[in-house]
């Protein structure tokens, strides 16, 4: 996995005649005890993780890092917070932690300058069956992959060429091209719809061979990823499943950090899902489902797809991404009474959109931030009792003034906090607000034509909803700013349209909105 995290799959590099320039390095920490030593107490997994995270930071405190965690365990309650996932959430948010009888102990408020991007594997299935999809869907993501603040990585596969080895005559490749890997767990049965959609993305995890007698070969080199050998630096080996997928995702995240050194961990996490694409196989299933809840269920199998390295590291003429990093105080007043907003004027070229006519256009929006988990396990089964706060985004409707927009957003936020359904329109969105507003990474895709998009006001709101900070009236959290990354991209399949140039000449300036009383 070290080779995958550093180089990615190595075949193309071996065939290339050019020198590969690396812009990131590896660090490693021994996480598991020796085979002869007693294992860690599961109640201490969070503390052990915190100690492992601290070691490289002490040695070299000023490096930007991506943490890759591929050690997982069976969840007690799939999808719901655990001591381990809460500890990982706290570490990602920049909180120091200890352990108490009732859960984790937060040793102070989160420090945004200490925030961390943690990549976690979704975990691997226990057994293989011919109906690999059902097996994957009935195998819930392992702990701590359900953590809100991490980037959870499942495995897909495009390795479908059967081996020519005579010993495998009659064997068939199990997974279809572009489908979920037979190795991967999913979030299909993850505790209902209160919790985040997981996994967030997929990466190549290899395939499995099956014969007619119910036997399976899960690790054939041709259906795995070629990489450096686990023990011999001069030899090649192979890796597969969700650990290999997570290592590749960590590599992409590290490359993004090197390419954009000013980006926060929250931003890079958002960029990973924002640049992800579904394979034709995945897309055919997502698009055929008309119900938003059904689409959400498919997301719990594939996430947002496979990150595109080119899109991750650059924009093109007909696909351009705007990245905003901002912070604000979500609530003010002694009782968190005043809700605050950020409004962003989107710099899309109205004329270019109108010129598109009936041509398809996509507006992709990603909102990424980190929550502070509640220290005590009591109330964790309520998502508003687990997270310190939440953020939401909403797009101004056609013919809606800015003041009407802010009043509507505030009204719907209050209803949402009370457990009511969001009044935001789901029209044209892939999953809609009811499905996307879970966790701390919110993404959705608006699809339509250029004139439809041009008719909106071009203003996007980011607003807060309450969590345990507000519910518990925590005086020591009043006035704390929270930060977020907002990524917005316009894409069109029209080849003769240049969206990049007119957008690049314009800047998105946040409009300060007055606080609105809750």
Question: Where do the PLM segments sit?
Answer:
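Substrate-binding/access-modulating region of protease and related hydrolase catalytic domains
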Residues: 31-147, 157-160, 234-240, 244-246
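Catalytic-core environment of secreted peptidases
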Residues: 1, 156-174, 178-246
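Long mid-to-C-terminal assembly/interaction modules of large eukaryotic proteins
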Residues: 360-518
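Hard-cation-handling environments
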Residues: 248, 265-266, 274-278, 282, ...
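Secreted peptidase-domain scaffold signal
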Residues: 293-392
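Short, small-residue alpha-helix embedded
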Residues: 2, 245-259
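Active-site core segment of subtilase-fold serine proteases
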Residues: 1-4, 8, 14-35, 61-66, ...
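Subtilisin-like serine protease catalytic core
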Residues: 1-44, 62-67, 79, 112-115, ...
């Amino acid at each position: 996995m070290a080779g995958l995290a550093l180089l990615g799959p190595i075949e193309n590099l071996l065939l290339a005649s050019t020198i590969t320039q690396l812009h990131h390095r590896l660090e490693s920490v021994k996480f598991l005890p020796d085979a002869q030593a007693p294992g860690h107490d599961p109640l201490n997994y969070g503390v052990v993780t915190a100690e492992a995270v601290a070691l490289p930071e002490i040695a070299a405190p000023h490096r930007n890092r991506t943490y890759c965690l591929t050690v997982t365990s069976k969840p007690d309650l799939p999808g719901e917070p655990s001591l381990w996932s809460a500890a990982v959430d706290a570490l990602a948010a920049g909180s120091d932690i200890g352990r108490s009888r009732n859960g984790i102990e937060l040793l102070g408020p989160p420090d945004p300058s200490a925030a961390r991007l943690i990549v976690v594997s979704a975990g691997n299935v226990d057994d293989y069956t011919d109906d690999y999809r059902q097996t994957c869907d009935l195998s819930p993501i392992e702990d701590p992959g359900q953590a809100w603040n991490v980037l959870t990585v499942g495995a897909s596969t495009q390795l479908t060429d059967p081996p020519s080895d005579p010993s495998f005559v009659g064997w068939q490749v199990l997974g279809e091209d572009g489908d979920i890997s037979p190795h991967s767990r999913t979030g299909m049965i993850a505790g209902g719809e209160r919790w985040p959609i997981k996994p967030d993305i997929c990466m190549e995890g290899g395939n499995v061979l099956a014969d007619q007698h119910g036997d399976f070969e899960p690790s054939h080199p041709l259906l795995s990823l070629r990489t450096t050998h686990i023990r011999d630096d001069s030899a090649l080996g192979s890796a597969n499943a969700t650990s290999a997928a997570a290592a590749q995702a960590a590599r992409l995240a590290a490359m993004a950090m090197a390419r954009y050194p000013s980006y926060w961990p929250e931003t890079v996490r958002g960029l990973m899902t924002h640049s992800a694409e579904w394979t034709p196989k995945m897309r055919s299933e997502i698009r055929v489902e008309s119900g938003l809840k059904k689409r959400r269920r498919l997301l719990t199998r594939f996430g947002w797809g496979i990150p595109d390295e080119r899109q991750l590291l650059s924009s093109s003429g007909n696909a351009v991404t705007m990245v905003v990093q901002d912070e604000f105080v979500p609530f003010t007043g002694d009782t968190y009474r005043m809700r605050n907003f950020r409004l962003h004027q989107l710099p899309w070229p109205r004329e270019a959109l109108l010129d598109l006519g009936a041509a398809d256009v996509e507006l992709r929006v990603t909102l990424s931030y980190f929550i502070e988990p509640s220290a005590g396990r009591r109330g964790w089964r309520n998502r508003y009792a687990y997270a310190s706060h939440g953020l939401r985004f909403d797009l101004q409707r056609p013919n809606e003034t800015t003041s009407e927009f802010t009043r509507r957003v505030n009204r719907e936020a209050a209803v949402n906090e009370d457990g009511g359904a969001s009044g935001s329109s789901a029209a044209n969105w892939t999953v809609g607000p009811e499905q996307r507003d879970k966790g701390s990474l919110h993404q959705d895709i608006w699809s339509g034509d250029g004139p439809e998009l041009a008719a909106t006001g071009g203003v996007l709101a980011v607003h807060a909803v309450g969590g345990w900070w507000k519910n518990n009236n925590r005086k020591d959290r009043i006035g704390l700013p929270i930060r977020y990354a907002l990524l917005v991209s316009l894409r069109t399949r029209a080849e003769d349209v240049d969206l990049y140039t007119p957008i690049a000449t314009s800047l998105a300036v946040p409009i300060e909105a007055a606080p609105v009383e809750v």
